[in-house]
């Protein structure tokens, strides 16, 4: 089964699978990122939009959110829930982001990066759409090991969707042009941050 079909078929019930504790972890991670008021943020791999209310709260009405996903039914679920004047939904792939060069200040990618078909190309595209001084944040509300074990156990379309080792992830983003790359991998969170200087 193609990954797009896998996520489209699960879209209607996706939100019921997200535990409250996971939402709280994501809120904490976003608070630590301290997204500047007024910034334009790309939510890459938005899914059903779990981060959208948190992002809107962070950037305020003077900021903006572009939420992109490759699975149209996941996007449809997000659009049912959220309408703000500074929120835009786009269907698209991480390897070919439908935005102009230097379009956003921040790219946040929650629980989506290992699902991209070409991680190197996705990192290059993230770099392209970020403004100079911009930041990428790859988030998971679980450890790398937990995510990889989960995907392996689920099998099917996601069985090979793995977060690479830290040195590989560092190389993927460094080769795309990012600097000041940091990776935190602990029991209840995984965060990679990089800057376009």
Feature roles, as predicted:
Residues 177-181, 185-197:
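Core SAM-dependent methyltransferase catalytic element
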Residues 161-176:
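Short alpha-helix
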Residues 120-132:
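A short glycine-rich, Lys/Arg-flanked "PGG" loop and its adjoining helix->strand segment in the class I
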Residues 1-37, 50-54, 73-77, 137-161, ...:
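Conserved class I S-adenosyl-L-methionine
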Residues 42, 48-96:
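Class I SAM-dependent methyltransferase SAM/SAH-binding core
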Residues 95-106:
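A short acidic, Gly/Pro-enriched loop at the edge of an enzyme's catalytic core
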Residues 106-118:
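A short SAM/SAH-binding and catalytic strip from SAM-dependent methyltransferases
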